[in-house]
Amino acid sequence: MNVLLVDGYAPHPKFFCKTTHMGNVTELTAMQKRSYGAPTVRIDKDHYKDLRSGCIHEYAHGETRADNADSVRRTLATVRALINCNVTVPQNCRWLTFTYAENMTDEKRLSADWKKFWQKFKRWCVRNYVDEPEFIGVVEPQGRGAWHMHVFFIWSHTAPYLDNNTVIAPMWGHGFTKTKSVTNCDNVGAYFSAYLGDMPLDEFQDLAPDEQATTFVINEKPVTDQDGQTVTKKIVKGGRLKLYPPGMNIVRSSKGVKRPTVEFSSYEEAQKKVCGQTQTFKAGYSLVGDDGNEVNQVYKEYYNAVRKDMQE
């Protein structure tokens, strides 16, 4: 199957459309032919059933970091949607970063250390009459093999003051921490998921050849160094994706976080629901089979309900 950009952008009004609501961001996916779900169903982590033939097959698990890159991209798309659903009012949120002083590479320890911190933080909230927030946490691999963790704390009201040096850092106790307000960004999920996938050029060049992306784009962005200082570095877009080990739980969240909502309609009806919102992206794709025949056309659009207000 090959994916090609369509010549001209013209989704038919009667095309089937999936509308995904993610806080202030709405995604429209219109398609010429409706997909009624995958032709397979998962049995367990190693086996699946082909619904067309009834046969049971084994999954071909990715054995290398390269095999895992596409899976990580899909997970980061989930992260993007989850953040956009919940981080909608910047003053109600805080973005925390947790690191290790040593080159800590143990995934299980990372999970255990986070759970211990979370229990301590909940007790601190009780003692200080602070409402317990919801959280979304995402792990980030470093080129040297160590792990960082980024966590969004989300309150239903203005976030309380959290002193990084006297509250968060001592409570964590494994390395430097950073606690900051969420910047007035109208698509925090897109910014953050790109932040997780990108990598400083100097770290990227130190990777083994099989860990490097085959093609990449270099930009300049502000990043936090090992001492917690913000510096400007050359960044390799998508350079960090291959550092995530296969099967790792990249994202974790509290039970109360909101999830994206989905509805189905014609493209024409979906357009009415985003009327007045600012379109931030659109692209059309042609899905072509190995025999050269077009299988389907898919059109994607993103709308932002806040950006219009910001521009007025």
Where are the regions a protein language model picked out?
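Right-hand nucleic-acid polymerase module
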Residues: 1-145, 156-312
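Cys/His-coordinated zinc-finger cores
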Residues: 149-153
